[in-house]
Each structure stands twice: as C-alpha cells, then as structure tokens.
Amino acid sequence: AGLSAQFMVDDAMALSFPDASFDVVWSLEAGPHMPDKAVFARELLRVLKPGGLLVVGDWNQRDDRRRPLNYWEKPVMKQLLDQWSHPEFSSIEGFSELLEKTELVAGKVQTADWSKETLPSWIDSIWQGIVRPQGLVKFGASGFIKSVREVPTLLLMRLAFGSGLCRFGMFKATRANAVVAPLRS
C-alpha cells in the first residue's frame, strides 16, 4: 500500500548508499561472490539504520577450522568454486564472527542451518529444466549448452550439501545504535 521499490546495480564491496539508509537489509546468495567477506559484512551493516534488521541467506562450507577438508572434499570444493567463479565460501560460524567483529551488531548474530530445508532444491532445479525446457532452448544453442553444463555442478552441490561439506546458512542481526567507525586493518 503505497510502497515502492527500485532495483539498482551497485558494488556490494563499496555501496553507494549513505550510512544508515535502510530499515532492513536482505542479502540472498551473494556472499560467495564477494572477495573480502569482512568488507561485505561491514557494508551490509553500514547501510542499515540503528535498530534495523539484517537478514542473510547464503551458501557456506563446513567450518574447516574445526574439521579440515579431507582428501575428497578439497577437489569437490575447488570444482564448485571454479565452476561458479566464487573466490571462497565462508562457514556459518566464520561469517557470523565477521558480522560481530564490525562492532555494529546489537547483541549476538542469530544463525540457523537450513541445509535440510534447501537440499531438495538442487535436484529440483535440474528437474525444472526438463519439465519446462523453454528456459533451456530460449537462448539458442549457446544457452542450451551453458544450462546442460550446469547439471554436473548442481549434482556436486547436492552431494556437498547432503554430506555436510556445504551448508545453507541463515543470519539475523540487529544494527547497534553506534556511529560507524573506520575499518581497521
């Protein structure tokens, strides 16, 4: 009712918005694309008004500080990162720590592992391409080849999420009533 929205392209590592611009900041599956997760975390919170709500949903890897990747997990993770040109995945624990280290969070960051709830989507995304082939053929031979090329990676993601190597993390934080301090190196 009277609400308006705009879609804009911006640099998530250096958002063009002034400090404290938004009541809510929502980020979905953007984190893996970010080369510096600490800068990304800070930018998400910087543009949030004091008392505002941050919600993030992202692909994450298991916290390898607690349990290092084994002999088969290392090549799987490398393939997933290479296929989708991601610099790295954070762990749920690691990204939560980065949010808290900004000192812009009131209290603790709440996290949840939604891997079980999102696991069926990997196979379903392949199935949707079969039952609705318009998307596969709409962009001609090149689009079809790119879509088919994704199938092994989607199956690999299903394996990674099913085995616990990858996790779908949800994050909720409230912006503290603090002035934004300069980023420390």
Where are these regions (language model features)?
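Acidic carboxylate diad motif detector
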Residues: 56-58
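A short SAM/SAH-binding and catalytic strip from SAM-dependent methyltransferases
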Residues: 23-36
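A short glycine-rich, Lys/Arg-flanked "PGG" loop and its adjoining helix->strand segment in the class I
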Residues: 38-53
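Substrate-binding/catalytic lobe of Class I Rossmann-like enzymes that use SAM or dcSAM, i.e.
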Residues: 68-168, 174-177
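Short, charged low-complexity linker/loop segments at the C-terminal edge of domains
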Residues: 176-184
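Conserved SAM-binding strand-loop segment of SAM-dependent methyltransferases
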Residues: 2-14
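Short, catalytically relevant binding-site loops at active-site mouths
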Residues: 14, 60-63, 86-88
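A short acidic, Gly/Pro-enriched loop at the edge of an enzyme's catalytic core
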Residues: 13-25
